[in-house]
Amino acid sequence: MDLTGAHMLKIHRPSIDHPFGVDLWHLFEQLSIKTIGWNPSEFEYIPGKTPMSQWSSVIVSITAYYVIILSGRAIMTNRKPLKQRRLFQLHNFILTIISGALLALLVEEVFRNYMRNGLFYCVCDSRHFTQRLVTLYYLNYLTKYLELMDTVFLFLKKKPLAFLHCYHHGITALLCFTQLLGRTSVQWGVIGLNLYVHVIMYSYYFLAACGRRVWWKQWVTRVQIIQFVLDLILCYFGTYSHIAFRYFPWLPHVGDCSGSLFAAFFGCGVLSSYLFLFIGFYINTYIKRGAKKNQRKAAGKADNTSVAAAAGSEALAATTATNASPFSARSRKL
């Protein structure tokens, strides 16, 4: 099997169609055909027929996720942690590569459409729900089930299962499903930002699992918060434009944004909850704990100063007493 042929890697001068100087979609297509016999250019998302496109399969999968992690945590209560370091490294490395590849393919397609048709077309026009983008949306959706393994590693290592982590992982799979089903044209922005964050996040986990000291841990959460702010700007704009155009045309708007109202409201609600939860997590983890840590350090320094001062006072008193003794003896002799 030849995976290095010149016909696979087509080099171009950077342009609207090939912003990276390489035809990434062609490369992805050829690799997919040669490795797994699947042509992404022929993919068609059909609700109810495409794998994991039925409400029943999605609900069962997410329910199974919560059952597994809760029962798994209970099973591990009286057992020693299973670190699975190599497997954890591989998991994070794979997700870093997948996220980066999907992000590059997404940028290539969106950039082409943006340069030819403008920003509003990309955000709101139903024609921007292209076959290539739908394929990438679907592949991104499938990765959400792979990401559920994050929690499995947590309970195997007997790490605490925070509500934010479990809620976020389970609901994100449902969120991606509803947006595919609702054909929201704005979802490329949310997915692109999420993929960018995941490149940072999973590369951090990979490096940490390899024993590297990574200084930018806090920035993972900061970038996630920025991501949700930008997500909500896009989603609220799209939802408002759709409602104003369809139901309240007397309100100021710039045109219709395609997608179902259910998908729009569900997306706005979920992303809003993410923003509040991640801000709360950041405050509790880095600000409050940091303040307490500084207080403990200050208290430790104060204790050390007090001990040193007390020791100095005792030494001074002893020295004074020693120096005073001869004069006392002389006075008694006189």
UniProtKB/Swiss-Prot annotation:
<dbReference type="GO" id="GO:0031965">
    <property type="term" value="C:nuclear membrane"/>
</dbReference>
<keyword id="KW-0276">Fatty acid metabolism</keyword>
<dbReference type="GO" id="GO:0034626">
    <property type="term" value="P:fatty acid elongation, polyunsaturated fatty acid"/>
</dbReference>
<dbReference type="Pfam" id="PF01151">
    <property type="entry name" value="ELO"/>
</dbReference>
<keyword id="KW-0808">Transferase</keyword>
<comment type="function">
    <text>May be involved in the synthesis of very long chain fatty acids.</text>
</comment>
<feature type="transmembrane region" description="Helical; Name=2">
    <location>
        <begin position="87"/>
        <end position="107"/>
    </location>
</feature>
<feature type="transmembrane region" description="Helical; Name=5">
    <location>
        <begin position="188"/>
        <end position="208"/>
    </location>
</feature>
<dbReference type="GO" id="GO:0030148">
    <property type="term" value="P:sphingolipid biosynthetic process"/>
</dbReference>
<feature type="modified residue" description="Phosphoserine">
    <location>
        <position position="325"/>
    </location>
</feature>
<keyword id="KW-0472">Membrane</keyword>
<protein>
    <recommendedName>
        <fullName>Putative fatty acid elongase 1</fullName>
        <ecNumber>2.3.1.199</ecNumber>
    </recommendedName>
</protein>
<comment type="similarity">
    <text>Belongs to the ELO family.</text>
</comment>
<feature type="topological domain" description="Lumenal">
    <location>
        <begin position="1"/>
        <end position="51"/>
    </location>
</feature>
<feature type="transmembrane region" description="Helical; Name=7">
    <location>
        <begin position="261"/>
        <end position="281"/>
    </location>
</feature>
<keyword id="KW-0275">Fatty acid biosynthesis</keyword>
<keyword id="KW-0444">Lipid biosynthesis</keyword>
<dbReference type="GO" id="GO:0071763">
    <property type="term" value="P:nuclear membrane organization"/>
</dbReference>
<feature type="transmembrane region" description="Helical; Name=4">
    <location>
        <begin position="161"/>
        <end position="181"/>
    </location>
</feature>
<dbReference type="GO" id="GO:0034625">
    <property type="term" value="P:fatty acid elongation, monounsaturated fatty acid"/>
</dbReference>
<feature type="topological domain" description="Cytoplasmic">
    <location>
        <begin position="73"/>
        <end position="86"/>
    </location>
</feature>
<feature type="topological domain" description="Lumenal">
    <location>
        <begin position="246"/>
        <end position="260"/>
    </location>
</feature>
<feature type="topological domain" description="Lumenal">
    <location>
        <begin position="108"/>
        <end position="135"/>
    </location>
</feature>
<keyword id="KW-1133">Transmembrane helix</keyword>
<keyword id="KW-0812">Transmembrane</keyword>
<feature type="topological domain" description="Cytoplasmic">
    <location>
        <begin position="157"/>
        <end position="160"/>
    </location>
</feature>
<feature type="transmembrane region" description="Helical; Name=1">
    <location>
        <begin position="52"/>
        <end position="72"/>
    </location>
</feature>
<feature type="transmembrane region" description="Helical; Name=6">
    <location>
        <begin position="225"/>
        <end position="245"/>
    </location>
</feature>
<feature type="transmembrane region" description="Helical; Name=3">
    <location>
        <begin position="136"/>
        <end position="156"/>
    </location>
</feature>
<keyword id="KW-0597">Phosphoprotein</keyword>
<dbReference type="GO" id="GO:0019367">
    <property type="term" value="P:fatty acid elongation, saturated fatty acid"/>
</dbReference>
<feature type="topological domain" description="Lumenal">
    <location>
        <begin position="182"/>
        <end position="187"/>
    </location>
</feature>
<feature type="topological domain" description="Cytoplasmic">
    <location>
        <begin position="282"/>
        <end position="334"/>
    </location>
</feature>
<dbReference type="GO" id="GO:0005789">
    <property type="term" value="C:endoplasmic reticulum membrane"/>
</dbReference>
<dbReference type="GO" id="GO:0009922">
    <property type="term" value="F:fatty acid elongase activity"/>
</dbReference>
<dbReference type="GO" id="GO:0005783">
    <property type="term" value="C:endoplasmic reticulum"/>
</dbReference>
<feature type="topological domain" description="Cytoplasmic">
    <location>
        <begin position="209"/>
        <end position="224"/>
    </location>
</feature>
<keyword id="KW-0256">Endoplasmic reticulum</keyword>
<keyword id="KW-0443">Lipid metabolism</keyword>
<dbReference type="GO" id="GO:0042761">
    <property type="term" value="P:very long-chain fatty acid biosynthetic process"/>
</dbReference>
<dbReference type="InterPro" id="IPR002076">
    <property type="entry name" value="ELO_fam"/>
</dbReference>
